[in-house]
Amino acid sequence: MPTYNQLVRFKRKSKVRKTKSPALEANPFKSGVCLVVKTVTPKKPNSALRKVATVRLSNKRTVNVYIPGEKHSVKEHDRVLVRGGQVPDLPGVKYHVVLGAYDIAGVKGRKQGRSRYGAPRKQVVATKK
């Protein structure tokens, strides 16, 4: 505990918070261009082929981005919208592609959790009674 005189001479230092998605530069989303689409294997206890893209963001930074959902339409040179969000079992992947934005289609046939996968709402047909 500092004395009163110590606080007069040196003010308290505030804690520096470290961001988990530095390439976004405090923005919720950034747009970018897809350079490479590839599959990556996860860390030890898990086994799969996770879909990952390398994207050059509008601020000239290059990042690895996870493509969520089943089947995707991401190709090289596609424009993508990137949000923060780590993938726990993929080292170095700290960002997600936003499906249903720009050149990327949403997941087809999705009924639950549609907003996360860019799936449109099913149209209900009115019936006469």
Curated annotation (Swiss-Prot):
GO MF terms, alphabetically ordered: rRNA binding; structural constituent of ribosome; tRNA binding
What GO CC annotations are associated with the protein?
small ribosomal subunit
Keywords noted in UniProt: Methylation, Ribonucleoprotein, Ribosomal protein, RNA-binding, rRNA-binding, tRNA-binding
> Which stretches does the entry tag as region Disordered?
110-129
| PROSITE patterns membership | RIBOSOMAL_S12 (PS00055)
Q: Which Gene3D superfamilies match?
A: Nucleic acid-binding proteins (2.40.50.140)
Classify the source by domain of life.
Bacteria
**Biological process GO annotation list?**
translation
- Pfam families in the cross-refs: Ribosom_S12_S23
InterPro entries xrefs? NA-bd_OB-fold, Ribosomal_uS12, Ribosomal_uS12_bac
3-methylthioaspartic acid: residues carrying this PTM: 89
Say which family it is in. Answer: Belongs to the universal ribosomal protein uS12 family.
Q: What does this protein do?
A: With S4 and S5 plays an important role in translational accuracy. Interacts with and stabilizes bases of the 16S rRNA that are involved in tRNA selection in the A site and with the mRNA backbone. Located at the interface of the 30S and 50S subunits, it traverses the body of the 30S subunit contacting proteins on the other side and probably holding the rRNA structure together. The combined cluster of proteins S8, S12 and S17 appears to hold together the shoulder and platform of the 30S subunit.
Family annotation (HAMAP family): Ribosomal_uS12_B
Q: How does it assemble?
A: Part of the 30S ribosomal subunit. Contacts proteins S8 and S17. May interact with IF1 in the 30S initiation complex.
Q: What is this protein called?
A: Small ribosomal subunit protein uS12
